[in-house]
Amino acid sequence: MIHWSLIVSALGVCVAVLGGYCGWILFPNMVHKKVEQSVVIQDGSEQFKRFVNLPQPLNFKVYIFNVTNSDRIQQGAIPIVEEIGPYVYKQFRQKKVKHFSRDGSKISYVQNVHFDFDAVASAPYTQDDRIVALNMHMNAFLQVFEREITDIFQGFANRLNSRLNQTPGVRVLKRLMERIRGKRKSVLQISENDPGLALLLVHLNANLKAVFNDPRSMFVSTSVREYLFDGVRFCINPQGIAKAICNQIKESGSKTIREKSDGSLAFSFFGHKNGSGHEVYEVHTGKGDPMRVLEIQKLDDSHNLQVWLNASSEGETSVCNQINGTDASAYPPFRQRGDSMYIFSADICRSVQLFYQTDIQYQGIPGYRYSIGENFINDIGPEHDNECFCVDKLANVIKRKNGCLYAGALDLTTCLDAPVILTLPHMLGASNEYRKMIRGLKPDAKKHQTFVDVQSLTGTPLQGGKRVQFNMFLKSINRIGITENLPTVLMPAIWVEEGIQLNGEMVAFFKKKLINTLKTLNIVHWATLCGGIGVAVACLIYYIYQRGRVVEPPVK
């Protein structure tokens, strides 16, 4: 007859095997399937509601480079800047869904973004703080003018011809030009080498005052509110040539310049982002392939950008124009150590690769940290297999012989239709060719590197943000008086951090729905495994012990 301890020991082994099976096979498969179901975007689901309205707003922090020696810069001095901020805004995102694809694997939407100033988080800074900053709109106009002078003049021609006979000074100029070059259809239909160009530039210099509010330097004194959102006004009641210039600026289509109700124009960095969106996104819902959830499939009905140089004369799409990854509001699930992932930013017209760095803990939630690699805005050129970013749209600036910018700087001219240069904050990692020309920069990898902490199982972002800086070259432009003595420098304007820190409510929700469940399953796993092994071993020892106590009968 089998001893009861052997039966109990066998049961203990069964319990241990069951615990191992549950902990290493059944529970992971159950969790994996549950996560797959929860991340897929289906009409009416909880994930769909979170997709349409983010559960909490993003943090949008702006740091401004206040210029402390603007008068001396006009005379050729090296710029001195001081960082002020952060000015913190809550960024609310709401998606207006257009439609699902027939098979439910794609969803199209337009995203509306709204910014609310967070006075508490920004204190002691306020939106009414006064700053002296780079006059972005005037500087951009002059540099575009320098690069495309003939096209700009021809663009002005139709408007100006109707005004020439109404403006006495210009009538005289027209007669003089006709004597010099013969009769023309338009006084502006001239080449860059035309001797009459100097006379026209005199009028341009004179009309800069009317266009840009009588500027005394390439810097503007304004409020943070105006510089970032409400707009720095210019083109206030212009006349003659000034009005033609303003009309040309207005019709250039720049997102950062808007027309006011009184007809004037206003420049702001982010005013155009505050309100209804225009770009139509198509993203993967995760149906059929949860690893592709939120992956951008199309932007404005195109799989690729048409911003950067393409790989061949036949128009083969270059790596620079490829749209990869999500919009950084969430990431695909089931992350692994050592992997990488992409985010796409429409603000800089490119995809950015993030690489695994280390394991982290965020308020008791385990995750992985990802950060940009050295290839983000490193050296650009054929020898680095990224020459498609070398648009070479800037004249007479600090750049290499091949026309590409030095390491750490990316020309966004073709992205923003303005000569804006992207760097990391405080020009972190940028070439000394740029950093040596500015005083007051304090690059710090911990403060200025882009990173994101992600819960590895679900792909939920825990904290982190995109950190980038917007700059513009400051330089002397031939025959433009206000720029005559300027040094050639890459001038910082602002840097921004757009990201998230999961708040207490979301942390509690996340722990309740996932972390506590995982802990419970883990406890069940190890309790059954260890308990079963313990019972089996204990009963086996007891059985052996009892066998040893059996007294053999004496031999007769």
From Swiss-Prot:
Pfam families: CD36 (PF01130)
UniProt-listed GO biological process terms: cellular response to pheromone; sensory perception of smell
Membrane topology: Multi-pass membrane protein
Single GO term (MF): scavenger receptor activity
One Gene Ontology CC term in the entry: membrane
Cytoplasmic side stretches: 1-6, 544-556
Tissue specificity as recorded in UniProt: Detected in the head and to a lesser extent in legs and wings.
Keyword terms, alphabetized: Cell membrane, Disulfide bond, Glycoprotein, Membrane, Olfaction, Receptor, Sensory transduction, Transmembrane, Transmembrane helix
Lineage: superkingdom: Eukaryota
Membrane-spanning intervals of the chain: 7-27, 523-543
Record-annotated disulphide pairs: 320-388, 349-415
Signal peptide feature range: none
Chief location bin: membrane
Stated family: Belongs to the CD36 family.
PANTHER family to which the protein is assigned, alphabetical: SCAVENGER RECEPTOR CLASS B TYPE-1 SR-B1 (PTHR11923), SENSORY NEURON MEMBRANE PROTEIN 2 (PTHR11923:SF109)
Role played: Plays an olfactory role that is not restricted to pheromone sensitivity.
Name of the protein this chain belongs to: Sensory neuron membrane protein 2
